[in-house]
Structure formats: C-alpha cells, structure tokens
Amino acid sequence: MAGNFSEIESQGNISLKFGFLGLGMGGCAIAAECANKETQIKNNKYPYRAILVNTNSQDFNKIEIKNAGNVRKIQLEGYEQGAARNPQVGEEAFVKHETKIFETVKQEFEDRDFIWITCGLGGGTGTGALLKAIEMLYEHDYNFGLLLTLPRDAEALKVLENATSRIRSIAMNQEAFGSIVLIDNAKLYRKFEEENPSALANEYTSYSNKYIADALHEINLVTSSFTPFSDTHFDASEFAQVINTPGVLSLAKLELKSNQLDTENPLGYLTQLGNALEKGVLYDTEREELESAKKSALSIVTSPLRASRLYNFSFLNQMENFLKDRTPYVDERPIAPYVNKHTAKKEEDIVKFYSVVAGLPLPKRVSDIIDEITRIKEEREQANSKKSNAVLNKLFAFDDSVQEEKPKKKKLNFGAEPEVEVADDSQPTKKKLSF
C-alpha cells in the first residue's frame, strides 16, 4: 500500500550521511527521531546526527533519545518559558545564541553530506528561527534542505498565519538551497485515525515523527543497499543531486504482489503506480505539479526469484514510458531495478516501487491553508458584526426616559401642639444628577 513504510532490511547501507538541525518543539522531535534510526552497519549503528535548538526547557524532557552521543541540545537561555507562538521571539532567541549554534553545527556536522533543517511551521520558536537558520547555513556554504510540517485546518488562526507567512518568505529564496520536504499533518492525521481508531490522542505525535523518519531513512537506504539488476542505476551521488535540487521534493512508495504485475495488461498496475505518485508519502501532489518537476527517479526492489521473471525488456520499457509521461520535462529520470538478496520468506512475492521527484512547485495544500485563513477571517468578521449590531440595536431601542414623581412632603403632627406651617422656601432645592 502506498506510503505504508515498514522497517527496511537491517543489512542496508545508507547512501548519504544526514545531519538534522531541529528548531522548536516540533522540529526537535522530528530531528531526534531521525537520529534514533538504527542499522546493523558495523561502527555506525546510529548513522545520523542531530542538533536540537529550543526555548522551552520542558520540551526537551518529552523527547526520547536512544544515543546521546549523536544528539546535542541547545537551550536558548533567557527564553526558557517558550515563545508563545510569537515568531519574533523565536527569531530573537536564535540570533542571540547564533554564535553558539554555529559552533555546534561545525563540530557535529563536519562530516555530513547534507543537512536537513526540521521545523513545525506555525509555532513561535521554530517558525521564528527558521529564516535565520537558513541564512546561517547558506552564508557558510552548507548543502542543506528543509523538512517542514504544515498545520492542520483545525489549528488556531495564528498558527495558520505564522505558517503561511514563513512559506512565503521561503518561496522567495528557494533557489538558494536544496529541496523542501513538506509534511502535511492533515494527511498524516487522517492516516493515523484510520489505522488506529482507538488510539489515544497523544500517540499521534510519536506516530507522525516515526513515520517521517522512516520515510526519509528508507529512501536513503534504497539507493545503496541492493544489487543492481541492469546497467541502469540510481546511486548515492544521483540521490545527492536530487535532494540538492531547489523546489519541493515528493517521496512515494507502492507495494504490489507479483501476480498484480501483468506486463501484457499493464493498465491496472500503472494506474496504481500513478495514484501512488500523486498521493505521495508525506503530502499529496497533482499531476500538473508533477509535470513541472526538474528531476525524478524510480527504484524497483524485489527478491531474486521474482526479479528473474519480472525484469524483462517489456516491463522496464513500460516503467520508462510511465515516468516519462508523468515527469516529461525533467533533466534526468533513471529507472533502477534492484534485487534484494536478503528478502524475508514472507516478502519473496512482493515488489516495491520507490520514487523521488524534485523541483516541484508548492502543493495545493498550501493554497488550501490560505483559503482556510480567508474563510475564518470572513466568518469571524460576519459573526462579530452580527453580534455587535444586535447589541447596538437593543441599546438604541431601550427607552430610559422614565418620569419620576416627586413624593409629597408629609406634614409633621405633634398631637395637641399647634400646627406649624413649614415655609416652602426653607427647603433646599435637590441637585439633579446628569448622565
């Protein structure tokens, strides 16, 4: 099933050494989960490194770290209470500690092939620090890209506005750095709900962070872990070129049983592959968006038994035509059939397709968030106006001109004593109140 990432074979080798610079609560959690990925590579059990940068000191306590030697935490002193979803505070905190952050980057990421800045868009610390982190890595000539989560529509208006504001700034400068991987939280949330209907709400964060880490880790293994079946190959250097391509990067995966791959009648599985390409693993794309891609690649992995039957001229020709049809204007689009010699018995009949498409425009999901912001503002204005008018109408209709009758003054009566008449001018005039 497309996007259903399971743990890849433990014997795999990574293609590129990634470093993860986590910003804010969301970005730190993703970066830490990526650094938690394990392999059985000798002397490299934990192949990735992470630097976690945050204001709120309590957030660090929520993050699980399997190997402390691969993770560095930077507490932005003076901002321990957090940024309260105010990006200006997050930016100020990063700038104040930028020297310390950069020194840590030099130490921890010296041997890294590529750095991912991870951030949950919409908050204060990560969203605020993001542009300054981009400037820092850009000024010092690092190869880097962005791993950003998009908020769900259910988030508060301020969160949606913070996210779109940063996306606009990034889009204006996206040619200056590598790929942007967007994670649609709405998509992952729906997937989590479908797969775990009885799960607790707080389990989603752990699920999504692991899902993101698995997706990136698996594609980094595919390009370096299996035996090429033909001369066509998608190796680590080509993968590096893809993720260094400016624009948005889409990852996709599809698993099929070999009996679903009828090369005499390819329409069925090519349709499924096309749907997987558009659905993606982390966010949805549209066919028109794919057509504007700059680079694409398709890797196919199966067991030795199935490879000898499946990887014929007809099948590979169908794959080439399929990718050409979906990404017609790319600079490169290799088709790479692989053999997994360590396939488990239960997966001998499975064929896995992995695609990477780079240089894409911003997806429709960003436009949907902007539409949601507009809708909320319009409905809020209408609601406030309606309520305000109702109150004013009542207030102006209220008649407070009540005439009060002045009580007659009672005459005193002392019994048999002669009645004394009180003169009217002996009583002071009562001062009227004025409102």
From Swiss-Prot:
| MF terms in GO | GTP binding; GTPase activity
* InterPro entries (UniProt xref): FtsZ/CetZ (IPR045061), Tubulin/FtsZ_GTPase_sf (IPR036525), Tubulin_FtsZ_GTPase (IPR003008), TubZ_C (IPR049364)
GO biological process per UniProt: cell division; plasmid partitioning
* Alphabetic keyword roster: Cytoplasm, GTP-binding, Hydrolase, Nucleotide-binding, Plasmid, Plasmid partition
Q: Kindly list the GO CC terms recorded for this protein.
A: cell division site; cytoplasm
Task: Describe the function of this protein.
Answer: A tubulin-like, filament forming GTPase; the motor component of the type III plasmid partition system which ensures correct segregation of the pBCXO1 plasmid. It is essential for plasmid replication. Binds GTP and forms filaments. The filaments seed from a DNA centromere-like site (tubC)-TubR complex which extends to surround the TubZ filaments. Highly dynamic filaments grow at the plus end and depolymerize at the minus end, a process called treadmilling. TubR-tubC complexes track the depolymerizing minus end of the filament, probably pulling plasmid within the cell.
UniProt family annotation? Belongs to the FtsZ family. TubZ subfamily.
**How is this protein organized at the quaternary level?**
Forms filaments. Binds to the TubR-tubC protein DNA complex.
Q: Domains: what does the record tell us? A: Consists of two domains: a nucleotide-binding N-terminus that hydrolyzes GTP and a C-terminus domain necessary for polymerization. The domains are bridged by a long, central helix. Interactions between the C-terminus and the following monomer drive polymerization.
> What protein is this chain from?
Tubulin-like protein TubZ
